[in-house]
Amino acid sequence: MKKLLPDLIAILAFVLLSFAYFFPADIENRILFQHDTAAGAGAGQEVKEYYEQTGERSRWTNSLFGGMPMYQIAPSYDSTKSLQWVQKAYQLFLPDYVCLTFMLMLGFYILLRVFGIPVWLAGLGGIMWAFSSYFFILISAGHIWKFITLAYVPPTIAGIAVSYT
């Protein structure tokens, strides 16, 4: 346990820093308008109504581009429900914006620790990675899928590196 203490302190610092950054928004229950998220909800409305009427999930919508598969807009498969719990655990069940920033810091921290970087430098690297401007541009635009994909790149590389060592 004593060996893990510095890593646990770094993770706790990531949580506190994420909460501190979004503190005004969390306290006042503000919601950031994200155009692509709103547009995606509108695009999926037809399929949502179909599900409410029939109880069946449609895999196609006519509301975009004369027809489009739903897996690109709002995928919902029974097989992914078990993975949602794993994702929430990785996010420490934190609120939306807080968990996004936390995921970036934690993922890059894991990568740097796998490569043998000391805790304090890995923590600093995670913070620098997370607070680069592009990620906040993605959040404000509503490009959450792209954001989450980029958040999972560093721990994925770390997993690959660990599997070959």
Per-range role (PLM):
Residues 5-13, 120-124, 149:
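Alpha-helical transmembrane segments of integral membrane proteins
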Residues 1-23:
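Start-transfer (signal-anchor) and selected internal transmembrane alpha helices
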Residues 17-111, 115, 127-154:
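Membrane-interface coil-to-helix junctions
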